Amino acid sequence: MRKIIHIDMDCYFAAVEMRDFPEYRGKPLAVGGSSDRRGVISTCSYEARKFGVRSAMATAYAFKLCPDLILVPGRMQVYKDVSLQIREIFSRYTQLIEPLSLDEAYLDVSECQQYKGSATLIAQAIRRDILAETGLTASAGIAPVKFLAKVASDLNKPNGQYVITPETLPEFVKTLSLRKIPGVGKVTAEKLSSLGLNTCGDVQAYSKPELLARFGKFGGVLIERSQGIDERGISADRERKSVGVETTLAKDIYSLEQCQQVMPGLIQELALRLSRSAKERKIHKQVVKLKFNDFKQTTIEHRSDEVSIVMFYDLLAQAMARQEGRGIRLLGISVGLADSILAVPEIPNAQTQLDLAL
């Protein structure tokens, strides 16, 4: 059995800000774009989350939920520098590290001999080192497989850890919600629920041929995950294929003009996320996605080697041509990343381009 640790920093961007600016501690704090420019929240403190503030939420809506919210702009270079410190701590215990973002990663410690090979003690040591050297807390999940390690890291947040052993795994997955399985979103969960399938235990008892007939290849994945099977290894050289941002709207909107009003905040957040890239990558396409109130979605893409805000607005107009009177529930934009290592993709002269687009 493998020993997989999933490390997830606690409200990372906000935690760095509270570390560097003690006056923010204990207060509802968010890192994100200005509400005046229809920005979105990147992350927020636990104090803000008590009011319902969440990542990817429109900043203006966040202020409605929490009028005393403290909003600060992101300092991406600082977050990158701290992330490198954390990565160095990981490397003391294993070289099998799969970064998922600046603030989370998978580690395979199956061959680590420190602490007599105890993944539980190794995770404790890593979290202790992170706190001592960066002043930040991290949560951890330990399991024999990747997706369960990620599930476990969320169970004792903040500043805690949870262990799923080979012995406890069968009982743990029986009651695990299918929404915790990667690939099971809202629409798929509703389809599964209509069949009486809400937990992994439900899937275990269901007809496997029928699942495969209804869901095809994903049905096979669902059967495996529901038994706690995940053969995916740690991809130490894993590279992201795209960077994007999307927002679920508080209420459905119907016009192109309303969608255009949402775009500036998404563009600001996309610029932040592009600057997080660990490696310098060139883009090869831009994409706009719309999800309608009947849960169907459409995407429009354009091949490009540089980010153009005007092009995002053109793609939005093309996507809206497929609306057919339906309400828009979600709007997203993204860029595809090329394999070549070139310049960090940026969004040049953003406000000028916005003025032109609008």
Swiss-Prot record:
Cofactor: Mg(2+)
S-S pairs: none
Entry keyword set: Cytoplasm, DNA damage, DNA repair, DNA replication, DNA-binding, DNA-directed DNA polymerase, Magnesium, Metal-binding, Mutator protein, Nucleotidyltransferase, Transferase
Species this protein is from: Shewanella baltica (strain OS185)
E.C. code: 2.7.7.7
Reaction(s) catalysed by this chain's protein: DNA(n) + a 2'-deoxyribonucleoside 5'-triphosphate = DNA(n+1) + diphosphate
Name recorded for this polypeptide: DNA polymerase IV
Any single GO CC term annotated in Swiss-Prot or TrEMBL for this entry: cytosol
Domain named UmuC: residues: 4-185
Record-marked site positions (Substrate discrimination): F13
Primary role: Poorly processive, error-prone DNA polymerase involved in untargeted mutagenesis. Copies undamaged DNA at stalled replication forks, which arise in vivo from mismatched or misaligned primer ends. These misaligned primers can be extended by PolIV. Exhibits no 3'-5' exonuclease (proofreading) activity. May be involved in translesional synthesis, in conjunction with the beta clamp from PolIII.
Pfam families on file: IMS, IMS_C, IMS_HHH_1
Family note: Belongs to the DNA polymerase type-Y family.
Compartments, record wording: Cytoplasm
Gene behind the chain: dinB
UniProt cofactor note: Binds 2 magnesium ions per subunit.
Subunit structure: Monomer.
Active site per database record: E104
Protein origin, superkingdom: Bacteria
Keyword Transferase: yes
MF (Gene Ontology): damaged DNA binding; DNA-directed DNA polymerase activity; magnesium ion binding
Residue sites binding Mg(2+) per the record: D8, D103
GO biological process: DNA-templated DNA replication; error-prone translesion synthesis; SOS response
Principal subcellular localization: cytoplasm
